[in-house]
Amino acid sequence: MQGMIHLYCGDGKGKTTAAVGLSVRAAGAGKRVLFAQFLKDGSSSELNVLRALQNVEVACREQNFGFFKAMDGQTKAAAQKAYSALLEDVMRKSADGVDLLVLDEAVAACNHGLIEEATLIDFLRRRPETLEVVLTGRDPSQHLLDAADYVTEMRKRKHPFDRGIAARRGVEF
């Protein structure tokens, strides 16, 4: 089966949730899943379930670098090093029998210069023929849009955050 590239983007809620759902579906079908998270510290609730699934490996960096806008130069350099290494690691692992690779928030990591978009695009072009890939994040470049076979845009129409309600564990993270 030819692998496809999925891009879940937009300013609405549900990008990671959709990627998790596809991961569960693939694992349930006996497929091997590698779920990598960028810009998150590994504490999101969905990872507890994914880590418990037999065919799923979770890859993330457990350091919390904070929000990109608040990073000083030293913190940004450390985040860039950590996330570039994460991308290299999952690219290498994906050649070893992985059926589905999720790169959660890879789009945002590219947008902030924490991973090289050219490296990601090159990987997407050279990936194993049967590897299905999911990318998530806001504001993908035209290069990423062009590389994708599926583009699904989640659009925010209304969100509790706009009323000052903070993210809730088990719902938003």
Regions found by a protein language model. Give the residues of each.
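Phosphate-binding/switch loop-helix module in NTP-utilizing enzymes
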Residues: 70-132
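Hydrophobic/aromatic ligand-binding patch that stacks against planar heteroaromatic rings
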Residues: 25, 49, 123, 143-144
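Short, glycine/charged-enriched secondary-structure capping and boundary segments
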Residues: 22, 48-51, 73, 115-119, ...
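Conserved nucleotide-binding/hydrolysis micro-motifs of P-loop NTPases
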Residues: 39-42, 64-65, 107-108, 139-142, ...
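Hydrophobic anchor at the start of a short beta-strand
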Residues: 33, 133, 151
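Conserved P-loop
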Residues: 4-92
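Conserved D-loop beta-strand region of ABC ATPase nucleotide-binding domains
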Residues: 136
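Phosphate-binding/switch region of NTP-binding enzymes
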Residues: 139-173
